[in-house]
Amino acid sequence: MEERFLTPKDIGEEQLTRTLRPQRLDEYIGQRNVKQRLKISIEAAKVRNEALDHVLLAGPPGLGKTTLAHIIANEMGTNIYVTSGPVIEKQGDLAAILTSLEEGDVLFIDEIHRLGRAIEEILYSAMEDFKLDIMIGKGPSARSIRLDLAPFTLVGATTRSGLIGAPLRNRFGMVLELEFYTPDELKQIIKRSARLLEVKIDDEAAELLASRSRGTPRIANRLLRRVRDLATVDGTGKILSKTVEDAMKIMGIDAEGLDDMDRKILRVLIENYEGGPAGLKAIAASVGIEADTISEVYEPYLLQSGFIVRTNRGRMATKKAYRHLGIARFNGIGPLWDSTGD
């Protein structure tokens, strides 16, 4: 399989990520239903000698969407071209990519929800009929020509599937929602990554690290690398529970996997807005980061873990958030919600 990046990457970080990335479905830990559906479709496409149907992978950051795109190309024995929605600014940019694809190739578009509407429209006929309609010239003399494309597989990844228009979404043969990982799955991922990084870690330390990883493999691997650094510096050479605890204190990550920004968001919601409801933009302005960053990076785990709930009027802190921060509710003011939002 040849892998070509159409988007600039941090080479060092990408090489390390590729070292830890599973290459086949049977190496991929977690997402059982997603793997089963992909396995059936891949095997069927290979039997029929066809390109795999287009795939949309949706879910919070760090759950393995990019990894699955590469696995799809590996399993199909084809090349993968990697780009992202914000990079494709002009119709000509996408046309150049599409016309360079060979039969069966995988085109992976990360952040596909950030494609412009005009770019999306080019994809309609490309995905459905493997045809490319482009305009030549301008004004009254402009004319449209249609080019044939080699059958290919588009794999799109998104953290905000609701922003993808129905015409584009409906052209994906498979729409797969990735879920947060269980502590046991994260423990398996951590132990596998430790073997690849050639660092020893005991079971208790792996379990502890998994519990701090927010249900997210990318975070688990990032924390593992930082804990490995501490084990190297302190001379033990092996990751023990104490190593993990010490590293978590240094990084400000608590027993629930919350970091300083998570706690700041909860504290602002409770102290500035009396527990809510509060709008996302108001919270973002108070903590000093973009609203999109909160909704894509922080909010999914805070919702999943029961620290906040979303209502028609905005976000509200739950009793669990108050307890976690050690803040008493003032004279009955505060959330009427328990940790499940009921």
Swiss-Prot record:
<dbReference type="GO" id="GO:0005524">
    <property type="term" value="F:ATP binding"/>
</dbReference>
<dbReference type="GO" id="GO:0005737">
    <property type="term" value="C:cytoplasm"/>
</dbReference>
<dbReference type="InterPro" id="IPR004605">
    <property type="entry name" value="DNA_helicase_Holl-junc_RuvB"/>
</dbReference>
<keyword id="KW-0963">Cytoplasm</keyword>
<keyword id="KW-0238">DNA-binding</keyword>
<keyword id="KW-0233">DNA recombination</keyword>
<comment type="function">
    <text>The RuvA-RuvB-RuvC complex processes Holliday junction (HJ) DNA during genetic recombination and DNA repair, while the RuvA-RuvB complex plays an important role in the rescue of blocked DNA replication forks via replication fork reversal (RFR). RuvA specifically binds to HJ cruciform DNA, conferring on it an open structure. The RuvB hexamer acts as an ATP-dependent pump, pulling dsDNA into and through the RuvAB complex. RuvB forms 2 homohexamers on either side of HJ DNA bound by 1 or 2 RuvA tetramers; 4 subunits per hexamer contact DNA at a time.</text>
</comment>
<feature type="binding site">
    <location>
        <position position="20"/>
    </location>
    <ligand>
        <name>ATP</name>
    </ligand>
</feature>
<protein>
    <recommendedName>
        <fullName>Holliday junction branch migration complex subunit RuvB</fullName>
        <ecNumber>3.6.4.-</ecNumber>
    </recommendedName>
</protein>
<comment type="similarity">
    <text>Belongs to the RuvB family.</text>
</comment>
<feature type="binding site">
    <location>
        <position position="218"/>
    </location>
    <ligand>
        <name>ATP</name>
    </ligand>
</feature>
<keyword id="KW-0547">Nucleotide-binding</keyword>
<dbReference type="GO" id="GO:0006281">
    <property type="term" value="P:DNA repair"/>
</dbReference>
<feature type="region of interest" description="Small ATPAse domain (RuvB-S)">
    <location>
        <begin position="182"/>
        <end position="252"/>
    </location>
</feature>
<feature type="binding site">
    <location>
        <position position="65"/>
    </location>
    <ligand>
        <name>ATP</name>
    </ligand>
</feature>
<keyword id="KW-0378">Hydrolase</keyword>
<feature type="binding site">
    <location>
        <position position="66"/>
    </location>
    <ligand>
        <name>ATP</name>
    </ligand>
</feature>
<keyword id="KW-0234">DNA repair</keyword>
<dbReference type="InterPro" id="IPR003593">
    <property type="entry name" value="AAA+_ATPase"/>
</dbReference>
<dbReference type="Pfam" id="PF05491">
    <property type="entry name" value="RuvB_C"/>
</dbReference>
<dbReference type="GO" id="GO:0006310">
    <property type="term" value="P:DNA recombination"/>
</dbReference>
<dbReference type="Pfam" id="PF05496">
    <property type="entry name" value="RuvB_N"/>
</dbReference>
<keyword id="KW-0227">DNA damage</keyword>
<dbReference type="InterPro" id="IPR008824">
    <property type="entry name" value="RuvB-like_N"/>
</dbReference>
<feature type="binding site">
    <location>
        <position position="21"/>
    </location>
    <ligand>
        <name>ATP</name>
    </ligand>
</feature>
<feature type="binding site">
    <location>
        <position position="310"/>
    </location>
    <ligand>
        <name>DNA</name>
    </ligand>
</feature>
<dbReference type="GO" id="GO:0000400">
    <property type="term" value="F:four-way junction DNA binding"/>
</dbReference>
<dbReference type="Pfam" id="PF17864">
    <property type="entry name" value="AAA_lid_4"/>
</dbReference>
<dbReference type="GO" id="GO:0009378">
    <property type="term" value="F:four-way junction helicase activity"/>
</dbReference>
<feature type="binding site">
    <location>
        <begin position="128"/>
        <end position="130"/>
    </location>
    <ligand>
        <name>ATP</name>
    </ligand>
</feature>
<feature type="region of interest" description="Head domain (RuvB-H)">
    <location>
        <begin position="255"/>
        <end position="342"/>
    </location>
</feature>
<dbReference type="InterPro" id="IPR036388">
    <property type="entry name" value="WH-like_DNA-bd_sf"/>
</dbReference>
<dbReference type="InterPro" id="IPR027417">
    <property type="entry name" value="P-loop_NTPase"/>
</dbReference>
<comment type="subunit">
    <text>Homohexamer. Forms an RuvA(8)-RuvB(12)-Holliday junction (HJ) complex. HJ DNA is sandwiched between 2 RuvA tetramers; dsDNA enters through RuvA and exits via RuvB. An RuvB hexamer assembles on each DNA strand where it exits the tetramer. Each RuvB hexamer is contacted by two RuvA subunits (via domain III) on 2 adjacent RuvB subunits; this complex drives branch migration. In the full resolvosome a probable DNA-RuvA(4)-RuvB(12)-RuvC(2) complex forms which resolves the HJ.</text>
</comment>
<dbReference type="InterPro" id="IPR036390">
    <property type="entry name" value="WH_DNA-bd_sf"/>
</dbReference>
<dbReference type="GO" id="GO:0016887">
    <property type="term" value="F:ATP hydrolysis activity"/>
</dbReference>
<feature type="binding site">
    <location>
        <position position="315"/>
    </location>
    <ligand>
        <name>DNA</name>
    </ligand>
</feature>
<feature type="region of interest" description="Large ATPase domain (RuvB-L)">
    <location>
        <begin position="1"/>
        <end position="181"/>
    </location>
</feature>
<dbReference type="GO" id="GO:0048476">
    <property type="term" value="C:Holliday junction resolvase complex"/>
</dbReference>
<feature type="binding site">
    <location>
        <position position="181"/>
    </location>
    <ligand>
        <name>ATP</name>
    </ligand>
</feature>
<feature type="binding site">
    <location>
        <position position="171"/>
    </location>
    <ligand>
        <name>ATP</name>
    </ligand>
</feature>
<dbReference type="InterPro" id="IPR041445">
    <property type="entry name" value="AAA_lid_4"/>
</dbReference>
